[in-house]
UniProtKB/Swiss-Prot annotation:
Protein's organism: Ralstonia nicotianae (strain ATCC BAA-1114 / GMI1000)
Gene3D superfamilies: ApaG domain (2.60.40.1470)
Origin organism lineage: Bacteria, Pseudomonadati, Pseudomonadota, Betaproteobacteria, Burkholderiales
TM region positions: none
ApaG domain residues: 1-124
InterPro entries, per the entry: ApaG-like (IPR050718), ApaG_domain (IPR007474), ApaG_sf (IPR036767), Uncharacterised_ApaG (IPR023065)
Name this protein carries in UniProt: Protein ApaG
Domain of life: Bacteria
């Protein structure tokens, strides 16, 4: 176990009611679970996302916290939230990182592994 470590799990779903395929707008919800698997209480301060569609168009999003929160996670605790993104193709990817500060002042990044955004039945 690393002294400073947050692990990230992701679930996604297509949002047909928010999408307009005829206008190249595909919306996806993603639910993130962030768990402090380290040894020190740590706070998520900011985030950076790289969102890529099937035509290699890239959007970058950065900002403070997540959904209005900067959660402080003691070891073993987790925080879950749901947000959404839109892309211009029925398939794409997201990846990124959370920027964190441990209780002792140490700064570190928690990687968000790349995950797929895909309409149902678009990926085999």
């Amino acid at each position: 176990m690393s002294r400073y470590e947050l692990t990230v799990q992701v679930r996604t779903r297509y949002l047909p009611e928010q999408s307009e395929p005829s206008q190249d707008q595909y919306a996806f919800a993603y639910t993130i679970t962030i768990r402090n698997t380290g040894e020190v209480p740590s706070q998520l301060v900011s985030r950076h996302w790289v969102i890529t569609d099937a035509e290699s168009h890239v959007q970058e999003v950065a900002g403070l916290g997540v959904v209005g929160h900067q959660p402080l996670l003691p070891p073993g605790e987790s925080f879950e939230y749901t947000s959404w993104a839109t892309i211009k193709t029925p398939v794409g990817t997201m990846r990124g990182e959370y920027f964190c500060v441990a209780e002792d002042g140490h700064r570190f990044e928690a990687p968000i592994p790349e995950f797929a955004l895909a309409m149902p039945r678009m990926l085999h």
